[in-house]
Amino acid sequence: MIQIIYGQDRFLVLEKRKALIDAIQKEKQDVETFYFYASDHEFNFGQVIEAIETVSLFGAPRVVFFYVEQEKDLHLVDIDRLEKIVSSRLDVDLILAF
């Protein structure tokens, strides 16, 4: 499942993220959750891709949250690669925030 959060108020975006992840964790057991923020100094888009593509060792469901808060950080995202991977992975809950 892919969910998109769009908004300029960081607090509201993070509140919605929490609500979505809480709902997923309530529905599924032992969820692995990964958080990525493009604004982080050491952000590496490859880690986002790796979190989406990597199969869980114990078959645990996964949630990947990826937040591009500022337009200036969009150049760090390989949109084509993300689109290809997302369209082929149905076993990962992906939350994209812009």
What are these regions (language model features)?
Residues 2-98:
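Non-catalytic interfacial helical region
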